[in-house]
Amino acid sequence: NNAVCVKNSMAYSRTLYYEDISYEEAKDLFIRPSGSLSQIEAKKLQDFMFHWVIQKATEHELPVQIHTGYLAGNGNVLDNGKPVKLNNLFLKYPEAKFVLFHGGFPWTGEYAALAKMFPNVYLDIVWLPQISRQEAISSLDVMLDCVPYNKFFWGGDCALIEESAGSLEFGKDVVAEVLTKRIQRGLLTEDLAYEIARGMFRENAIETFQLNEKLSMDFERMRM
């Protein structure tokens, strides 16, 4: 099929730390009656399954998107979404591509550091401009100092087209301000700033998610 990625949003209900659980232990848990697992046991089974998902995603060249940081709504365990808890996965699966969402807010520093340290970690700043415009501006400026600019994406992560359009305006406003200030400080040429912006809003995603190849296959099927 022409799937372009897989996504994990489990930070809403559990920690992002996924232990490496053996097949034998996971099998014993899986065959237990439904509802009989403790919270710790259920986590172990989830851990095993997500490792399996990463392995399959890697086989099929599908990037793995992961919700990090701030959780929508009220009353949750914010610490669940701490980006650095994913560190063991980045070490274990160097061939996988991981795309971290939302700037990892409020842990934007470790979010950026992970992308700097690991070649297979990419950053999608989706939501960050809406959460805090000023945080988005300052964090993106820091990230551009230390992370290659072909590792950035912008996504809407919205349910309605109106929300997507509004989210795009927020994102463009933040990126334009950051790049303009970097031009004024002599850190970028205008041509390079346009290249960075095109990458963030279009070209980087096309390359990383292999959209040209997969969309062309869809069009071919439509002609048949």
Region locations from a protein language model:
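Histidine/acidic residue-rich metal-binding segments in metalloenzymes
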Residues: N1-N8, T15-V121, E135-F153, F170-G171, ...
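Short glycine-rich, flexible loops that bind phosphorylated cofactors or substrates
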Residues: R14-T15, Q130
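Alpha-helix capping and helix-loop boundary segments enriched in small/acidic/polar residues
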Residues: N76-V77, I131, G166, L192
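Glycine-/small-residue-rich active-site loops that bind phosphorylated ligands and cofactors
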Residues: P106, I131, L160
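His/Asp/Glu-enriched short active-site or ligand-binding loop at hydrolase and phosphoryl-transfer sites
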Residues: Y122-R133
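Mid-to-C-terminal alpha-helical segments outside catalytic/metal-binding sites
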Residues: Y149-N150, G166-M224
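Intrinsically disordered, low-complexity polar regions and short flexible loop motifs
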Residues: D157
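Short active-site-adjacent structural elements
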Residues: I161-A165
